[in-house]
Amino acid sequence: MRNKYIEAFENAQIENKSVPDFRAGDTLRIAIRIKEGDKTRVQNFEGICIARRGSGSGETFIIRKIGANSVGVERIFPIYSESLESITVLRRGRIRRSKLFYLRDRRGKAARIKELKK
């Protein structure tokens, strides 16, 4: 059983942040605030959400993109992180799994996900 004070604090943290509705298979653009010395800048990371796990303030999601020289890059982000400037849903994917780890083995056209029809 969780402590009611910790739960109340986590709920207060979650209420302050608005997160769009997205699932695994969606293509996202994440704007990350990066602090270098005394300067801060915003860097975009665009890729497919391959997993979402956890609940409450500890919930995380994994984004995968294909970088330079066809190297796959995956990053794990906490949904309610202060370093996330914004989360934008670019495309909705039509999938039937909650975890898309099989995309790690696929290359090129085989790694595509169909778009969800409205």
UniProtKB/Swiss-Prot annotation:
Function recorded in the entry: This protein is located at the 30S-50S ribosomal subunit interface and may play a role in the structure and function of the aminoacyl-tRNA binding site.
Protein name: Large ribosomal subunit protein bL19
Domain of life: Bacteria
InterPro entries assigned: Ribosomal_bL19 (IPR001857), Ribosomal_bL19_CS (IPR018257), Ribosomal_bL19_sf (IPR038657), Translation_prot_SH3-like_sf (IPR008991)
Keywords: Ribonucleoprotein, Ribosomal protein
One Gene Ontology MF term: structural constituent of ribosome
GO cellular component: cytosolic large ribosomal subunit
Protein source organism: Campylobacter fetus subsp. fetus (strain 82-40)
GO biological process: translation
Gene3D superfamilies: 2.30.30.790
Record-stated family: Belongs to the bacterial ribosomal protein bL19 family.
NCBIfam families for this protein: rplS_bact (TIGR01024)
SUPFAM superfamilies: Translation proteins SH3-like domain
